[in-house]
Structure formats: C-alpha cells, structure tokens
Amino acid sequence: MSGVEEISTLDEFRERRSDFEISEDERRRSKIGNLKKKAINASTKFTHSLKKRGKRKIDYRVPAVSIEDVRDEKEESVVLEFRRKLLERDLLPPRHDEYHTLLRFLKARDLNIEKTTQLWEEMLRWRKEYGTDTILEDFDFEELEEVLQYYPQGYHGVDKEGRPVYIERLGKAHPSKLMRITTIDRYLKYHVQEFERALQEKFPACSIAAKRRICSTTTILDVQGLGIKNFTPTAANLVAAMSKIDNSYYPETLHRMYIVNAGTGFKKMLWPAAQKFLDAKTIAKIHVLEPKSLFKLHEVIDSSQLPEFLGGSCSCFGDGGGCLRSNKGPWNDPEIMKLIYHGESSLFRQSTRKLTDPHYSSSYISIHPSKAIQAETSAAESISCSDVPSSPTGRLCSASSHVNSAYEEARASDVNGYYSCDDKFAIPDKATNRKGQERQSQYQMRELNATTIGLKCETSSPGAPIIRWLHDLRVMIDKIKCENLAKRLLSLMLKLAAVFRYTPLELLRSQTTVSPSSLTEDDSRCSLISPPPREPTMKDRILPCLERIQKLEKSYEDIRNKPVAIPVEKERMLMDSLDRIKSVEFDLDKTKRLLHATVMKQMEITEMLQNIRDSQLHRRRRLFC
C-alpha cells in the first residue's frame, strides 16, 4: 500500500506542477497580449500624429443653409464670357471672382463687355491706390460719434425682401460743423469702409437670414428741415465725390431709394439741383414722397423695421442715440456671423432658378471654409514637408508637391469653367462621367509615376540606403501581422540605427530635386544636384541699366513726337463749354435787364402810391378846414 500512496502523491505533485505551469503560461500570454495591445496603440497614436501633422481635417458639421439664387440665362452667358475675358487679361483677383459681383458691373454698363472691362480696370486701379482691400483693418474713424451728431445716419433693419435698410436724416445735417470735426478725405474713407463692411458682412448675413441672394440696399433719405443752408460748396463737393465712388466702384448696390418728407420747395428747387450729381439709372430708382405719403413705405418695409419718425413702430434705444445708433439687423446675430467669419466652416446649399423657365431648378453646394482654418491647414501642410529638410521623406514630399502644383495649374488654366463659390454639383450623364473617370485615372497615374520617379532618382543618389529602408519600413508595416508587430518593429529600428551609423554625414546632407519638366518629358530622366549659381559679372550688372536707359529714351522720343495741338474731341469739349458760358452770360444779361425793369417799375409804383397818399391827406385837411 505504501507504493500506491507514493504513486498517488507523485501524481498530485505533477498535477499541482502542471497547474502552476499552466497559470504561469497564462500569465505570460496575458502579459504578451498586453504588450501587443500597448505596441499597437502606440503605433496607431504615432501614425495618427503623423497624419494630423501632415493635414488637418476640416469639420463641416454645421447646419446647411439653403439660399435661392434666381438667374437669367442671357445674363449668365454674358457673365461667363466677361469672366473668361478678365482671366485672359489677368484682371480677376480671387476675392472678386464671384458671379453677382461681375453681374453688378455688367448691369452698370448695360451688359456691354468692352465698357464693363474699362470700368473694371478703373475699379481695380482705384482699389490698389486707395488701399480698399485692407481699409477695414487699417482705417480707424475715431471721430465717428461726433460725426453722427451732425450727420445722423445708419443701418436699421431689413425690408420685406430681406435687403438692409440704410437711413440718413439730411435735414439734421450741418456740413459746416461737420468739417470742423473731420475732413472730406477721412469721411470718404469712412464711406468706403462702410461699403466694404456691407459687402463682407451685411449682404451675406441678410442672404442667410432671407434664404435668397441679397446684393443691394434700400435707402431712405429724410429731408425734413432741409434748406439752402445745407447746400454749401463743401456739401456739394462731398456729394459729388460720394456719388463718383458709388457709381464707378460699387455699381448696382442700390435697389431703391425713398426721399421722404419732401416739401414743395424741395421738389421745385433742391431736387432738380441734386439730379445733376446722379446718373439716369439712379434717378429711376428714386421715389420722392411727401409727408402725407409716408404710408407707402409700409408697402416695402414692415413697421417693426421702421423708426417712429418714419411712421414705424420701432423705438429701440441704440446706445443712447436712438434707432440709427442701434445698427439693428441680421448681421448682429451671432449664429449667422459664426457661419460667415468664425472658426466653423459654412455650408451653403444654393438653388438656382432660370427666369425663362420657372419649372427649371438646379441645386448646388458651395463650401466656404473660414480664414482661420485655411491658415491652419496651410501651415500644417507646410510643416509636414519641411520639418526635416535632410530626410528623404522630405525630398519625396517635395517631388509630390511639384506634381500637385502642376495639377493645380492645369486645373486653373481652364477658363471656360466657373470655379468660384457658385460651382455647380450637377448630376452628369454617362459620357461626362466616363470622361471624368478617365481624367481622374490620368491624374492618379501622374501621381503614381511621380512617386516612382522620385524613388528612382533617390536610388541613384548617395543617400539611397536610407530611402530603401524607409520604403521597406512602410511596405512591411502595411503587410505585418499583429502578433509579430513589436518584434519586427524593433528589428527594423535596429537596422535603421545601423544604417545611420555607417552612412557618412555628407551623404545625409546631400539633397536631390526633381524638376517638373522631367515628369512630362521622360520618366527615366531626373535632375540631380543643381549646379552652383554663377557669380554675376560686371556685364550682367550693367546690362539691365542699359536696357532701362533705352526704354526711357524710347518713351521720351514718343512723348516728344506727340503733336502739340489739342485733340479734336477736347477742342469740341472746349467749344461746347464756351458756348454754354456764352449762353449763361446771355441769360444773366437778360435776367439783369428784367431785374432792372422790375426795379424801375417798382419805383414808379412806389411813387404813384406816395402821390395818392399825399392827395388823400390834402383832401382831408380841406374837409376839416
């Protein structure tokens, strides 16, 4: 029995030992599994950090805004033709490449492309000289509060169609006191600044609120109390300069104008004088209303959007200055302004209808990323390729950036398409879809060829081992299995360390470049190290100066050879001006004679009245005597 007991105790010992070994194996496996999970998490974090570094994702999860956009087919074709011509002449900056901006200028010249091009060139020249593009940031109108005391004005609400309402109380304007506070030049800069603010803030905000395209304003001029005292030479110069800016540089931004509280004197004397500063199109948009006709404003503007002095029901405080200081409107809504300016991108869904066919409608999406996101994305992309200038990945990135820039230039060269905020996402047919797939495959093949060319070039360069190891690392990481991830990653890192150890420092510092022309001519060719720049000689320095002197001499000869005589058109203008002066002198002489005759007649009447009074007094004296 003792032998049996020994066998049983031996079996128990083996079972305990096997249980202990099994538990140890499980612990090891669990530890290995935890290590694998940690390695996978670390690798995913590392790759995600690299992806985030290379590009930033833009979150478009904002509420889509549907904006109706009604277009005329004829106007649209003229706009496309005008845009193509501007692109050919390099006269279309990106900030002005917008359908409704081009249409406004075309309407100002009756859809005449030649005349509109001249107006457009003048506008671009003026914006560059005046600094209009940065006037919102550069110009500070410090005297605004004092100016508004002597020239009450401001935006207040919207009309029934969603356009912003601009109000001026001309009857309470004092030009002489205004010029003591500011100057004409500073006030004109403030005028331009308000126009730019309307284009960049008020019109987009009203478009989002009204869900239709808003590109113009409704203006109300209150002329109650306006008289000759308000029409000084300074006021005339200011009005002329403002009308020049409005008509030439911001055309077709006025939808309609109402001159309210106009008396008989204004209609007969002041209104005819004011028409001399306006063009025919602007005059056709102006409606003159008497004090009894203020109710006509309610046909186009709701009473809640009108101040009390114009027959409305609004009596907002407006920072102590009444309705004109309140700046009431959709542009004060933080949610709307967040869509326009803030960090979130805005997604506008535009629906287009043609006037010729009311049943036709097409919708398209226009994405407007914010300026902050654009700057952040561009900065991240620039960092991703330029962090390590001596690394081969940086070289490959530079080669691919050359291809991307070439692709962008090829896409931008298509002037027949309209690539602005109004690009249509229409449903293509089979033929166009096939063409699009072919183009996409061509672009993909170009990028693939560029990558292979970059690899070929790098293999012939001195730092080829580094590129090969990094390429192998990328391929192996894609194909590797989870259970061997930590082991293989460690071995690859050791191999990389050995390569860096035995590779000379000069080979690491050498850089290669891939020229874009080699991508299109021959895939087997690649440009290696660029030759050092040649030092400029004395001849190279003198040659540009000689060319400039020759140009100056040529221009001087052209100016000298010009005829001294006055051109025929200017001579006609001078003759017409002389004729007008003569006619005015004749009218003045005639008026002078009439005034003289009137004075003489008045003196005769006065003398006759005096004689009659004397005779009556003489008769009374006789009666009393």
From Swiss-Prot:
PROSITE patterns: CRAL_TRIO
Main location (coarse class): Golgi
Membrane-spanning segments: none
Residue ranges constituting the CRAL-TRIO domain according to the UniProt record: 143-318
Gene Ontology cellular component list: Golgi membrane; plasma membrane
InterPro entries: CRAL-TRIO_dom, CRAL-TRIO_dom_sf, CRAL/TRIO_N_dom, CRAL/TRIO_N_dom_sf, PI/PC_transfer
Domain of life: Eukaryota
GO biological process: protein transport
Compartment list: Golgi apparatus membrane; Cell membrane
Keywords noted in UniProt: Cell membrane, Golgi apparatus, Membrane, Protein transport, Transport
Keyword Cell division applies: no
UniProt keyword annotation of Mitochondrion present: no
Membrane topology: Peripheral membrane protein
Family: Belongs to the SFH family.
Summary of the function given for this chain in its UniProt record: Required for transport of secretory proteins from the Golgi complex. Catalyzes the transfer of phosphatidylinositol and phosphatidylcholine between membranes in vitro.
PANTHER family according to UniProt: CRAL-TRIO DOMAIN-CONTAINING PROTEIN YKL091C-RELATED, PHOSPHATIDYLINOSITOL_PHOSPHATIDYLCHOLINE TRANSFER PROTEIN SFH13
Protein name as catalogued: Phosphatidylinositol/phosphatidylcholine transfer protein SFH13
Phylogenetic placement of the source organism: Eukaryota, Viridiplantae, Streptophyta, Embryophyta, Tracheophyta
